[in-house]
Amino acid sequence: MCILCDSAPALTELKIDIKAASLDQPEVIALITALNADLIERYPEDGSNHFRLDPEEVAPGRGVFLVAYVDGHPAGCGATRLIDPQTAEIKRMYVVPEFRGRGIAGRVLEGLERHARSLGARQIVLETGERQPEALALYTRAGFERIPLYGEYIDSPLSMCMGKPLHA
């Protein structure tokens, strides 16, 4: 089985399944490794300060890690976790380059927002950066707006935070 495919199916052939996954699954490890490499390439001066995700943060009742599968191949991922009873945070959003531009990130984001609502969150926030124009475009299309830096990102000059209310 291909962990991260070399060739993506044509757009007309896409069958996207979004499934909850644990952080120790081989395809999750491969996706996170690829995401980390992408972030290090975009932000070499930042090291890997913000690249962690504790399994407890995505444990049932606290969050979820979702994987998008296209025709059975892992194509993207994302996580959400509660940072307080009213606020969920999006983490670890990534789509394999061969699958980008096909709506996969939007499907993962929708699933994460649904899960955040199910946990009782009234708003959702995230951290990204200006060197991720595709992420900024996705989040803007999804209704996110810039917010002040928060939490571990307060002193990060490379960070850009966004958020939006979650309606029932």
Regions found by a protein language model. Give the residues of each.
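Short coil/turn segments at alpha/beta junctions that flank glycine-rich nucleotide-binding fingerprints
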Residues: Q86, R102, S118-R122
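C-terminal "cap" of GNAT-fold acetyltransferases
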Residues: E13, A21-D24, L31, R122-V125, ...
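Cysteine-centered motifs
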Residues: C2-C5
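Acetyl-CoA-dependent GNAT
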Residues: E13-K91, V96-E98, L109-G111, H115, ...
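Ala/Thr-enriched low-complexity intrinsically disordered regions
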Residues: A8-T12
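Active-site acidic-Proline motif in GNAT/NAT acetyltransferases
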Residues: V96-R102, E130
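Conserved GNAT acetyl-CoA-binding A-motif
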Residues: L109, A116-E127
